Amino acid sequence: MGSGAGELGRAERLPVLFLFLLSLFCPALCEQIRYRIPEEMPKGSVVGNLATDLGFSVQELPTRKLRVSSEKPYFTVSAESGELLVSSRLDREEICGKKPACALEFEAVAENPLNFYHVNVEIEDINDHTPKFTQNSFELQISESAQPGTRFILGSAHDADIGSNTLQNYQLSPSDHFSLINKEKSDGSKYPEMVLKTPLDREKQKSYHLTLTALDFGAPPLSSTAQIHVLVTDANDNAPVFSQDVYRVSLSENVYPGTTVLQVTATDQDEGVNAEITFSFSEASQITQFDLNSNTGEITVLNTLDFEEVKEYSIVLEARDGGGMIAQCTVEVEVIDENDNAPEVIFQSLPNLIMEDAELGTHIALLKVRDKDSRHNGEVTCKLEGDVPFKILTSSRNTYKLVTDAVLDREQNPEYNITVTATDRGKPPLSSSSSITLHIGDVNDNAPVFSQSSYIVHVAENNPPGASISQVRASDPDLGPNGQVSYCIMASDLEQRELSSYVSISAESGVVFAQRAFDHEQLRAFELTLQARDQGSPALSANVSLRVLVDDRNDNAPRVLYPALGPDGSALFDMVPHAAEPGYLVTKVVAVDADSGHNAWLSYHVLQASEPGLFSLGLRTGEVRTARALGDRDAVRQRLLVAVRDGGQPPLSATATLHLVFADSLQEVLPDITDRPDPSDLQAELQFYLVVALALISVLFLVAMILAIALRLRRSSSPASWSCFQPGLCVKSESVVPPNYSEGTLPYSYNLCVAHTGKTEFNFLKCSEQLSSGQDILCGDSSGALFPLCNSSELTSHQQAPPNTDWRFSQAQRPGTSGSQNGDDTGTWPNNQFDTEMLQAMILASASEAADGSSTLGGGAGTMGLSARYGPQFTLQHVPDYRQNVYIPGSNATLTNAAGKRDGKAPAGGNGNKKKSGKKEKK
């Protein structure tokens, strides 16, 4: 037994012979276990060893899973020892009230196999309630004419305990005039009556103060007191008399409040005030259910009666006359049961979750039905409502099992509302429903699904490292870890070592972050393969592709390719004939931008001009043309400051300075050049070393070429091939394009032949007159070098050679009217004996053709060896061909296309230039 229970808590198995006989016919009849314990046992107290009483061994307990199934959790079973323990407070008065016998009945459930055992625990009363009076004081009026032996009913006390622990005795404080008698009602409750021992004399003493004590026989006994104030009144020698000492009446529990129960009557032989009778309840507790008319004695129902709560009422009435004398009677009210209680459905042993892969017939819950009515009004049947994958099986009397009846799928129905309806057999029958919600547990049977089949995101270059560039989302209809999705990068078209330095992804949110600033010029797009994986076991996953497009920003300023500084850092100049008409193409500013799109769309603007209005600049082409003819007052040397802006926001720009000289020949320019101061000795020395280095490289190159040609001719064994070899010197300079533009989007490349010297002496290169069309045009008599603007103390003057007629366009070859001059074949051009001036014009032509892309200059066979392999990203479809307007000092002819050279014809003016070169050598 548990603590405090003693032998009273000892298990008492009640073998009965007739149960044994019945068991022969009913083998499935369950055995009932009885225990007796006192109330108010502490939580955890042992009621008895339920496992032992049921015949279970300790080894069977883990598999049998013995537990208690009851409406309220008063008891629990220890999983280790099988002992029945008290789990909540046991208050007998709260559980059973004044019932003489109090017992709790419940079922003990054992699994494997499933069995039910009826357990009865009788709760014994302890003396835990003190008798209490309904009032702390009573006032009693007694006539002085009252005779000794007259009895007066006093207010009774109430004790919630039963048996010996309830109210047993009343005691009155010692008095010469009064004594006390204990009386008992028909229901067993006791009440006190005070007896007058000696006559009273109002003139001697008007009142008396007594103490009434109520005692029980508990251990230890408890008591309470009430004060009695006795007032002595004048004589009234006749007390009221009821027509009956006891009234009995039967009343249905469904009567409405206000219904008359009965009417009592009383008479008084006195007259006047002493004969005026008033009725009242002797106990205040009776006024909760009934009402009494104090004048007529009519008793009516005050509140609704309930057979299940109280089956019988015992009411004590008092009749008091005007003189203060009273009489009492008892009214016994029997309550008749009606079918006024609907059955109740109580679910027990409910699981938290039912896994969606549960098998058919899986036990889900235990439910009980209860009806407070008696006899056939309390017999109940129940059924399951709705179309649900469950069914109800009868387990025992008023006990049912809920089991699965179909396959469950949480994704279709994550929960079920189960409604069980119970109906009794009363007339009319009553029914009630009880609903519970069963939650279906998840199984990882769904893989994550991305919101899109693929993702494409645009990211502007120069983004801050760590910035969010995109977010992918995947959903998983599963719950808990089965539906928790994490993200990772599975693959990419980047190098594996570089992947972590480019992007990363948040495993929780799917946000993709840039780990570095992207550069559109280096990386324009890349693709990632992302994976979403749930946390189930085994885990399920899905992949999706994310393509990242790096958008361009205007982060590169334009770069001017032409005009460029000379090899010695000096500025170059362009010559314009004096006779240039308005619209004459002077030169072209060539610039590139490493950006793309509108960020690389360049425009050209004149910021400053020494003679405003003399030249015009193409907004998109960068072509510098004469806006009017040269005036007498115009300076020979002109300077233009040109700004090149891109189309970005904000736009970036670069500037270039053009030096233009109006002259028909180089002779006119040389005096102006000689006026300039000599460069410093350091620069002259540097130029000297550069010239020596170039000369050595050229000599080595020529020697290698001569040896290669000689070997080839010897192998061919053709003497005629040796006659084509002429001693000469061909030099090809390095590209003037900045190195960083070799990988840009819009770079240009030019091949220049420049005479480098620290002095003003001009050096010319000679080549054989019979050059093939595939050779560099610089291998002729003329030198095509651009002259840097530098000082020289020694200048050699040369006469201008006659025009080279082979450099003219035929009528069919002319580009049209885009130039400013007519371009007829007989047009007069200034003569020039220096072939280097022709090269300057060719560079201008190639610069213009870099944007055209369709010219024969800059790459084809028979061209001047100028490579226009770079062009702007935008194509000027209608850029005019200005080759016919390019001024070539020393020649009045326009440029000839490559077709003429492919015919193998040498220029007509070549001999003249060669002769001039010979004169220079002689000098």
From Swiss-Prot:
The keyword Magnesium does not apply. Pfam families: Cadherin (PF00028), Cadherin_2 (PF08266), Cadherin_C_2 (PF16492), Cadherin_tail (PF15974). SMART domains: CA (SM00112). Residues 31-689 are extracellular. Gene3D superfamilies: Cadherins. Residues 797-832, 893-923 are annotated as: Disordered. It is found in: Cell membrane. It comes from the Eukaryota. It is a single-pass type I membrane protein. GO terms for cellular component: membrane; plasma membrane. Residues 1-30 form the signal peptide. Coiled coil: none annotated. The chain crosses the membrane at residues 690-710. Keywords: Calcium, Cell adhesion, Cell membrane, Glycoprotein, Membrane, Repeat, Signal, Transmembrane, Transmembrane helix. This is Protocadherin gamma-B4. It comes from Homo sapiens.
